[in-house]
């Protein structure tokens, strides 16, 4: 009976183990998770903090006991894999509660350890990062125990923006700082202006090109020379892959600690697969490497690896499109395709349109800005971005499907929209992009 060991029990690892069990009722499957919880919804965490998700239990899909009862898969939390011996096909495991170490053998090894939040490195009792449900609980408990009012949010990526919005909606008073003027980097820089407008509208203070210089209790000294007092600091300054323990093996790592995989999510070492934030692959629509640490990729990889292990060796990953979206107060920001800083590798043209998300005479209309970049040599779409109060998600998902099927920008004129006045136009924004490109 084959023995499958999975490292990490969140989106990628738990999903992969579950899919294997669906296809294979006999294999012995064991998951090691270094933290307290398994199968929690990472993307729900800011909304748990904001009390939009009314009960944290809704963010926790399974406990180890429930997972075993349903699927006959053993999950050991507080068990950290600290080394891999791929020649003997074993992993070294640390029980974080007892400090005992032991070795576990495997026939197949699936690595899904995820990423950890970067820290600014200040010694302070008021600083927090947000990576898992334990962090969420700590933030929530600190807010309640200390009657927190003023919160400094450091960083302006999509998670920080979600956290800031949820703190505000909870009734707290957040301030945002970011070390450069480049916020929400997955979006075109000039399309991020509504973020600043939404902050101004709510009189939420923010400073770009600003950093913390020192923390002394609740007194924060900034690089600008300003000194301010805050009850709490939440750092959202990026992540790094949890790959240190992999250095003990023969698995190839890139210079940033990510693991290159093939289209079966195999590493360079036999019988070892990698899924989730730690894996790096390639784009689907262009010949460039891609690392897309988002939920869809982890779930897709989990299914492909499960199929491979269950015996379907014909299934392969065709690449990322990098589809992403974030809500910030009244606006939605979405994009798909290569990142803005990767466009310089192509000879491209850009076409854009701004018009109402639905028929102008129907109430509640608001502008939607849609932009498409296409390759001048074959006129295929390289990237698209959309910003608006409604309809951005629909347009980006349609363009994602167009890119998946290698449609040209001209073929967007043939897109048949589901039209009624509350939803769109007879000639939709996507059609208009195609016409303008001609």
Swiss-Prot record:
Keywords annotated in UniProt: FAD, Flavoprotein, NADP, Oxidoreductase, Redox-active center
Active site: 43
GO MF annotation, one: CoA-disulfide reductase (NADPH) activity
E.C. code: 1.8.1.14
First-tier enzyme category under EC: oxidoreductase
Domain of life: Bacteria
Protein residues bound to FAD: 8-33, 267-277, 419
UniProt xrefs under InterPro entries: CoA_disulphide_reductase (IPR017758), CoA_disulphide_reductase_staph (IPR023536), FAD-bd_OxRdtase (IPR050260), FAD/NAD-bd_sf (IPR036188), FAD/NAD-binding_dom (IPR023753), FAD/NAD-linked_Rdtase_dimer_sf (IPR016156), Pyr_nucl-diS_OxRdtase_dimer (IPR004099)
Chain residues that bind substrate: 15, 19, 22, 39, 42, 71, 299, 427
Residue sites binding NADP(+) per the record: 151-166
Catalytic reaction list: NADP(+) + 2 CoA = CoA-disulfide + NADPH + H(+)
Cofactor note: Binds 1 FAD per subunit.
A Pfam family that the UniProt record links to this protein: Pyr_redox_dim
Cofactor section: FAD
Keyword Transferase on entry: no
Family indicated by similarity: Belongs to the class-III pyridine nucleotide-disulfide oxidoreductase family.
Additional record remark: Reduction of disulfides occurs by a thiol-disulfide exchange reaction, but involves only a single catalytic cysteine residue that forms a stable mixed disulfide with CoA during catalysis.
Assembly with partners or alone: Homodimer.
Entry domain remark: Contains 2 FAD binding domains and a single NADPH binding domain.
Task performed by this protein: Catalyzes specifically the NADPH-dependent reduction of coenzyme A disulfide.
Entry protein name: Coenzyme A disulfide reductase
Organism classification: Bacteria, Bacillati, Bacillota, Bacilli, Bacillales
